[in-house]
Each structure stands twice: as C-alpha cells, then as structure tokens.
C-alpha cells in the first residue's frame, strides 16, 4: 500500500541520517502525491505508472500555490488563501523538486523490490530558465 511504503521509506531515510529539512520535503511531497492518487482510487505503489506522474505534474501546474494541504488538520491554521501568491503558478523549480523527491522514493521502492521500475522518466523534469545568466 502506497501509504505504508511511504512510511517505510521515511524510516529508511531517518536511519540513513538524512537532514530534517530533506525528510520534511520528502514527506510533504509524497503526502501531496498520495492525496492525488487517492482521489483517483490508486492505493498501491505498484499501480503507479508514468501517465499518473504526467497527470500529477499537470495538476500541480493547474491548481496553483497553496491550494492543497499535505496535512488534513494542521496544528494551527495558516490561512493560505490570505497569501498574495495564493493560487499563482507553481514554479518549474518547485515541480522539479517534487519530481526529485518522488524519484528518490521510487528508486528506493525498486531497490526494495516493491516495484520493477521507476515510473518517473528522466525527461519529466522541466527546463528552467535561469535569471540573470549572461552567456
């Protein structure tokens, strides 16, 4: 089950001594992706295919910033709708970070023999325009 696999992955990351910031980023990314999967009735890690990854990227692009919360009941409300950037486009850098975090999870799943291959393809990352770089 995806949710249990994520918990096992997080435990493995903790045993490896990954930084707290990295752990938080992984967990948040994988929870948000888990919500996306649950909305589509996907509960098993082995059910996830490349078209799900593409659909998730499209969904992230369309929904905008802060429109989904990784935690169902936050400890304290932070009123994301009050932010000036609420609903604005999610940057390619952020989407690439999500993909990198998801790729780490799926690579772990392959090593643990939970899945046969990583559903994220190398060309899924988005080309990022660099600001202020002069050739």
Q: For each predicted feature, which ranges?
A:
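Onset of an N-terminal alpha helix
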Residues: 2-6
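N-terminal core-binding DNA-recognition domain of tyrosine recombinases/integrases
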Residues: 7-24, 31-133
């Amino acid at each position: 089950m995806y949710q249990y696999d994520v918990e096992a992955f997080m435990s493995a990351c903790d045993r490896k001594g990954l930084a707290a910031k990295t752990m938080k980023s992984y967990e948040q990314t994988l929870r948000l992706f888990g919500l996306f999967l649950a909305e589509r009735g996907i509960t098993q890690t082995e059910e996830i295919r490349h078209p799900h990854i593409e659909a998730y990227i499209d969904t992230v692009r369309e929904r905008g910033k802060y429109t989904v919360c990784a935690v169902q009941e936050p400890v304290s409300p932070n009123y994301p709708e009050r932010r000036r950037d609420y609903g604005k486009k999610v940057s390619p850098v952020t989407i690439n970070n999500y993909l990198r975090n998801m790729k780490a999870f799926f690579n772990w799943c392959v090593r643990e023999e939970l899945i046969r291959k990583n559903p994220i393809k190398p060309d899924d990352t988005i080309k990022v325009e660099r600001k202020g770089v002069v050739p």
